[in-house]
Amino acid sequence: MKKSTVIVLSLAAFVLLSVMQFSAAEDIKMEVEEQRGYCAEKGIKCHNIHCCSGLTCKCKGSSCVCRK
C-alpha cells in the first residue's frame, strides 16, 4: 500500500513539474519575440509576430490581422 502511494505521488509530481517547465518555456519564447522590437501595425498579418501596443491579433478563418 505504501509503495503504490509513493509511486503515484512521484508520478504526479513529475507530471506537474513537466507542465510547469513547458509553460515557462512558452513564456520565455514570447518575451524574446517582444524584445526584438518587431511588431505588426493595424491591418498587418500577425501570425508570427505580436501586434504593436493597443492592438490585438484577431482571426477570421485562417487570416489573422492586428486590430483595435
From Swiss-Prot:
Disulfide bonds join C39-C52, C46-C57, C51-C66, C59-C64. Coiled coil: none annotated. The keyword Disulfide bond applies. It comes from the Eukaryota. Expressed by the venom gland. The presence of a 'disulfide through disulfide knot' structurally defines this protein as a knottin. This is U4-agatoxin-Ao1a.
